[in-house]
Amino acid sequence: MEFWGVEVKNGKPLHLDPGLDRLVHISQVALGESKNNVTEPIQLYVTVGSDKLLIGTLSHEKFPQLSTEIVLERNFALSHTWKNGSVFFSGYKVDASDPEPEDLIDDQLEAAGFKAAPKSAAKQVNFQLPNEDVKAKQDDDADGSEEDSSDDDDSENSGDEEEEKVTAESDSEEDDSSDDEEDDSSEEETPKKPEEPKKRSAEPNSSKNPASNKKAKFVTPQKTDSKKPHVHVATPHPSKQAGKNSGGGSTGETSKQQQTPKSAGAFGCKSCTRTFTSEMGLQSHTKAKHSAAA
């Protein structure tokens, strides 16, 4: 490596050739002295082949010099726009075939009075395990991969079992819902008409309460025991019933209580107004109610 520097005068581009297997490194550009106070900006150019590139802009007041990092390996030309002075380009040349140009640069800098940056003292350490340790580590890795694969298989199997369980539960729920629907449909069926009671049973309130007849459709009548005494209440004649309804509710009810059908053969109590259908019932009533009073 050798120092390199040129002066580029005004109005003329400077053509340069790095040479065979040589590189030119431009590191600094500075303006020359000026007799007149120049305030205009000065532009710097480098031309390589047919390409003209702007390096930078200098000014005597603000930027009289410029640091660059330009490396050229073939013919080039330097130029500027200053009409009253010269511009100086400096750097160094390097042999392109040199295997270690950095060492040459450091030596040149030290010779020029610059201290090169110290190289890092840290060395790369290659951590290499012994063969036995490497083999053991590979075995451990293989075992770990097998365990991971077995865990994955177990998780997949458990996932399949859970899916089957869920489908079974959904099927059972559907069966239960279908059974419930069948039960509801059976309950909604029209109930069978109950058998008509025997003629012997009394129906005194059939004309008074028509609503009771509707309820009788849903209730199975109980069979009457012929052995037990039965209280028979006479049903009034329709013509009499109509007269009672037109005459008033309270008068009709009083007349019903006072009427005793004699044609039915009822036995009446002499001490009170109660009637019975059999003599046995009358005797039981007399013993229970009136014998104690006598």
Swiss-Prot record:
Induction (UniProt): Repressed by abscisic acid.
Compartments (UniProt record): Nucleus, Nucleolus
Annotated S-S bridges: none
Region (Disordered), start-end ranges: 124-269
UniProt feature, compositional bias: Low complexity: 203-213
GO molecular function: hydrolase activity; transcription cis-regulatory region binding; zinc ion binding
One record GO biological process: negative regulation of DNA-templated transcription
Expression across tissues: Expressed in leaves, roots, stems, young plantlets, flowers and siliques. Highest levels in ovules, embryos, shoot apical meristems and first leaves. Also expressed in somatic embryos.
C2H2-type zinc finger locations on the chain: 267-290
InterPro entries to which the protein is assigned, alphabetical: NPL, Znf_C2H2_type
Keyword Repressor: yes
Region annotation Required to repress transcription: where it falls in the sequence: 2-5
Biased composition (Polar residues): 252-262
A Pfam family this chain is assigned to: NPL
Keyword list, A-Z: Acetylation, Chromatin regulator, Developmental protein, Hydrolase, Metal-binding, Nucleus, Repressor, Transcription, Transcription regulation, Zinc, Zinc-finger
N-acetylmethionine modifications at: 1
Primary location class: nucleus
Acidic residues bias: start-end ranges: 140-188
Any one of the GO CC terms: nucleolus
Family: Belongs to the histone deacetylase HD2 family.
Role of this protein: Probably mediates the deacetylation of lysine residues on the N-terminal part of the core histones (H2A, H2B, H3 and H4). Histone deacetylation gives a tag for epigenetic repression and plays an important role in transcriptional regulation, cell cycle progression and developmental events. Involved in the modulation of abscisic acid and stress-responsive genes.
Description of how the protein assembles with itself and partners: Interacts with DNMT2.
Protein name: Histone deacetylase HDT3
Organism, as annotated: Arabidopsis thaliana
Gene field: HDT3
